[in-house]
Amino acid sequence: MQTSILIKSSCRPQFQRRFHHRMQKQIQNIISILSSASVINSYDENDIRHSKPLLVQMDCNYNGYVAGIPNSLVTLSVCSGLRGTMQLKNISYGIEPMEAVSGFIHKIYEEKYADTNILLEENDTYTWFNSEYQVRKSSEKTDFIKLFPRYIEMHIVVDKNLFKPANMICRKSVGKECDFTEYCNGDLPYCLPDTYVRDGEYCDSGGAFCFQGKCRTFDKQCDDLIGRGSRGAPVFCYDEINTRGDNFGNCGTAHCLFQHILCGKLVCTWEHRDLISRPNLSVIYAHVRDQTCVSTYLPRRTPPPVNSPISITSYYSAEDRDETFVQDGSMCGPDMYCFEMHCKHVRFLMNLKLCDASNHCDRHGVCNNFNHCHCEKGYNPPYCQPKQGAFGSIDDGHLVPPTERSYMEEGR
């Protein structure tokens, strides 16, 4: 991997003056912490970049102090002319070559800093412990390091970096029917956004809807809540329980109206003789038409909100729901789905003008959450045309044919 260093200057020459000062040569050589293969990128006043290998500049940077002046600091570079900074008690000077003039001629100017904390000050402990970078060698004296903190603004730029190969899985699907796997595309250092079947598409052989990447079946919700093969209850169980208007049967603040009874509390069947046992979970049992129907309740963990509406239950809004409620996206009738304890038409979830699987996907794919076709194996997106080895969508990162390696290169 090749690394380049971009050094940014935060100060500009303010004025020029002749300056002569006698300095004692108390210089320490800076030992580079970077690879000798690194590159120095600098920009001139016209924003033109100049690149030089770091190797030839590793032994031409020095720092020290001015003889006879306490608390002074000198940082010099002779890599390309004489450049550097001389910092005295309350003033700092810079030196650099005059590029427009031939010969060994330099200009010296007073430097102005926006952050006065960087200058030497009475409390040198502040500058040492509050600096973002602290570098020292074991051979250096601690007192000298604390007295002369050095500052540089540096950005590490990655010019060449090997990413994971294209078509490598970066996020596995969480369900077989409604969620899709995402792949590395070889050009980006991060995984693409999650892709899944568009909300309102059928799953579970037409018995449920996909919603937010999951197939929302009543059987799965009941098994997750109380386990042991519990299944979603028949409609007459929901009618019996969700019209009660208490903590075990409700659509929020009150009982459910008949058209919404499948969207309130989750009602399950229980075929075992022993009772349901789960910490903090209260359960009621109702025997309806030879079915044992159960509903559950979890005590509130937080007090009701201020100025909340009147409620004959312990729930005040859709945000109060927990796993004892029917999940949004559950089927509550033909082409109907639950949303916030109301039964609604599923057609409002889908924009068939943007994506209609029977027309846009050539009947070999399904619309995803970006309203693009996700194609079956052997069919190529975006319109699911036959192609060996192809599948997926333009959103999941899968490429055909795969590339073995991909680099991010400067100027690409």
UniProtKB/Swiss-Prot annotation:
The keyword Lipid biosynthesis does not apply. Residues 111-199 form the Disintegrin domain. Pfam families: ADAM_CR. The keyword Ribosomal protein does not apply. InterPro entries: ADAM_Cys-rich, Disintegrin_dom, Disintegrin_dom_sf, EGF-like_dom. Residues 351-385 form the EGF-like domain. Highly expressed in testis. It comes from the Eukaryota. Keywords: EGF-like domain. Gene3D superfamilies: Disintegrin domain. Interacts with TEX101. This is a non catalytic metalloprotease-like protein. This is Putative disintegrin and metalloproteinase domain-containing protein 5. The gene is ADAM5.
